[in-house]
């Protein structure tokens, strides 16, 4: 747990009592602060109370007595419709911030480095890889933010340690003063536009990661898209080191990095390499870490190979760009896709359709995806269990070398699952069930 006792904030409201909110409330309470914690969901309030959080109804709070509102990132405060509690907080002049902002303030001036990683796609892999490289080299490191535990539940680090935070656009909006020793923007493509009032708001939230940096700190940016190229051109005008990353020239040998397939992972690796070099690691130590990286669940996770058919869990691919990264890695694909679609659907994936032997469509997007796929062989399966069963049967009948049953939905999961992790776990469970009747 992060020590917040030195914070000048005396009374803090916490809205949203999931993982990060509970961690924030407990850290603030442990620091002797007055905490008013609330969640609109009664079940979340009960679970938080059982964890030791003091519950107070923020709908009737006296906001003149509250210094700051620590807001869970999933709660809207501007677009599309702000939560009523955030409206009251703003009207009272209360500062809105996040648990990640509180962490940044707590370690300021203590000789602990802070790395932040954002981007529409690739954040989690880059964060996990960076943490792995640093730990493999013997650097005291904690990773968190949007990945793993809440920021304030991370372990304290000694001088010279490194916190590596994965940050979403939602989280960056709630970090008004944080400055990062190494700030990374991997890429930008349209996503979460309703929460940011359009593309301009989304880009502005991502760009916030570079705010306030000064000489001696490092900015790392991918330049595969027009938005990032424009940001990089602006960053060139500052007196801060800027590193442009190129997936075609990642900087070290990735041939033995088996958990990092594809061009998109070359970009993730290039970013992690740039981060570690900025923090003083030798290339030999970085290379050893690349080769030993085990990968992440739900990100092109190879689950099993049955009867010559490989099953890949890429449930984290919640938009077309992410799914395209996976589709570009394999030649004979039995593709499971669908869920709650993002703007544009899968139109941008047409270049990969020749690789798709058959597509199995699930969830709300199935009919729209069917129209886009056109003459590409496909069927509407409805649910994941049916899709896995049908994909495996077809792949076995076809007998193609290198056949892959790929769950890379290009959609959010919320029509059938609470999150992408549950969707991916169900896929893994279904593959395990197939093992009973299939030769390895």
Regions found by a protein language model. Name each.
Residues 1-98, 102, 261, 281, ...:
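N-terminal leader/targeting and accessory segments in enzymes
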Residues 2-11, 23-31, 140, 258-356, ...:
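Nucleotide phosphate-binding/pyrophosphate-handling subdomain across enzymes
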Residues 11, 64, 73, 77-223, ...:
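Phosphate-binding loop of NTP-binding sites
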Residues 28, 69, 117, 146, ...:
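Residue-level signal for inorganic ion chemistry
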Residues 33-40, 219-223, 336-337, 354-365:
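Short internal beta-strands
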Residues 34-39, 142-143, 164, 244, ...:
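Short beta-strand "acidic-cap" motif of Rossmann-like dinucleotide-binding folds
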Residues 39-44, 58-59, 101, 148, ...:
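Short, polar loop motifs at secondary-structure junctions
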Residues 85, 346-403, 438-440:
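C-terminal helical cap/extension that packs against the catalytic core
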């Amino acid at each position: 747990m992060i020590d917040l006792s030195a914070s000048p904030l005396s009374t803090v409201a916490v809205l949203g009592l999931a993982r990060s909110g509970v961690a924030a409330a407990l850290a603030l309470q442990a620091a002797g602060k007055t905490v008013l914690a609330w969640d609109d969901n009664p079940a979340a309030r009960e679970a938080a109370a059982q964890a030791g959080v003091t519950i107070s109804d923020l709908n009737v709070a006296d906001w003149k007595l509250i210094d700051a509102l620590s807001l869970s990132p999933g709660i809207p405060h501007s677009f599309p419709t702000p939560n009523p509690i955030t409206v009251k907080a703003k009207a009272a002049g209360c500062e809105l911030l996040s648990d990640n902002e509180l962490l940044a303030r707590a370690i300021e001036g203590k000789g602990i480095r802070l790395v932040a990683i954002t981007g529409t796609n690739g954040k989690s892999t880059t964060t996990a890889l960076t943490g792995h490289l640093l730990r493999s080299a013997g650097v005291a490191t904690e990773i968190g933010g949007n990945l793993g535990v809440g920021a304030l539940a991370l372990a304290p680090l000694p001088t010279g340690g490194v916190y590596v935070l994965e940050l979403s656009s939602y989280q960056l909006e709630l970090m008004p003063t944080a400055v990062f020793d190494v700030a990374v923007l991997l890429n930008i493509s349209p996503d979460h536009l309703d929460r940011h009032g359009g593309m301009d708001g989304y880009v502005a939230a991502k760009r916030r990661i570079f705010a306030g940096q000064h000489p001696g700190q490092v900015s790392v940016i991918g330049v595969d898209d027009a938005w990032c190229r424009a940001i990089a051109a602006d960053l060139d005008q500052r007196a801060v080191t800027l590193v442009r990353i190129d997936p075609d020239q990642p900087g070290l040998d990735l041939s033995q990095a088996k958990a990092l397939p594809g061009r998109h992972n070359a970009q993730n690796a290039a970013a992690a390499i740039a981060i570690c070099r900025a923090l003083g690691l030798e290339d030999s130590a970085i290379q050893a870490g690349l080769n030993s990286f085990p990968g992440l669940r739900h990100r092109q996770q190879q689950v099993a190979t049955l009867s010559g058919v490989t099953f890949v869990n890429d449930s984290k691919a919640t938009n077309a760009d992410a799914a395209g990264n996976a589709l570009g890695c394999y030649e004979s694909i039995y593709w499971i896709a669908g869920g709650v679609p993002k703007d544009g659907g899968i139109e941008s994936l047409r270049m990969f359709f020749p690789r798709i032997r058959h597509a199995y469509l699930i969830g709300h997007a199935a009919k729209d995806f069917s129209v886009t796929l056109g003459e590409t062989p496909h069927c509407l399966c409805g649910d994941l269990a049916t899709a896995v069963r049908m994909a495996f049967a077809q792949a076995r009948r076809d007998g193609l070398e290198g056949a892959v049953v790929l769950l890379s939905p290009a959609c959010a999961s919320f029509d059938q699952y609470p999150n992408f992790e549950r969707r991916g776990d169900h896929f893994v469970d279904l593959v395990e069930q197939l093992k009973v009747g299939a030769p390895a």
